[in-house]
Amino acid sequence: MYYVLLSGGSGRRLWPLSNEARPKQYLKLVNKEDNSMERCSMLQRVWAQLKEAGMAERTVITAGADQRELIKSQVREAQIAVEPGRRDTFGAVLLSCAWLWSRGGASKDDYAAVMPVDPYTEEAYFETVKQLEEVMKKSGAEVGLMGAVPSYPSVKYGYILPGERKDGWISVKGFAEKPDEEKAEELMKQGALWNCGVFCVRIGDILKRAVSYGVPEDY
């Protein structure tokens, strides 16, 4: 399986510390995992975790051309798929799969797990991501999602509504995008999961969709 880190956002939630020129994922605000007093960026932290999990060599970071040098200055060995313009998540996924197939050594039968660049998570998160390929094959699904059990009725996350429970996976009955607090509490009682923004697709399926839109499958 291959992995995609989406890093193309403008990251202005920490303004004025972060801005268009220096999005939040590149600010050195978090402690390194080695218990030193040094700080690192969210990108550097997640990249170190990917290396520890044995995933970094099969990972591409997808970002705009204006962020390329920032990425290289922080994770020199990273492979980067450069977006010519912002086209939101689906456009970034199309571009990433085209890069993996034409530049990254992937075949159309390989799977790609797409992740945000700035999760503040532990080792178990990455071990779960690794399981997505097997779940996709067992379930026959076109898209695999990763959810988290909510700890409070957040209005900042989307919710995945669970369907039938299978051996190691749950079918998806529906979604609720950033509900109000009352609705979020109701969803929690129904066993809904937070949408982590992590999903898995077969590369060939995405390239086929790209061609149907008149977009070339080569990067």
Residue map of PLM features:
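Conserved beta-loop-beta/alpha segment of the NTase-like Rossmann-fold superfamily
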Residues: 72, 77-166, 207-212
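Structural signal for conserved beta-strand scaffold positions within catalytic alpha/beta enzyme cores
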Residues: 28, 82, 145, 174-177
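N-terminal glycine-rich phosphate-binding loop and ensuing alpha1 helix
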Residues: 1-70, 77-78, 82-87, 95, ...
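Short, solvent-exposed loop/turn segments at the edges of secondary structure
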Residues: 21-22, 155, 170
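Acidic-glycine-rich active-site phosphate/pyrophosphate-binding loop
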Residues: 63, 67-75, 171-180
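Short beta-strand segments
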Residues: 5-7, 62, 113-116, 146-149, ...
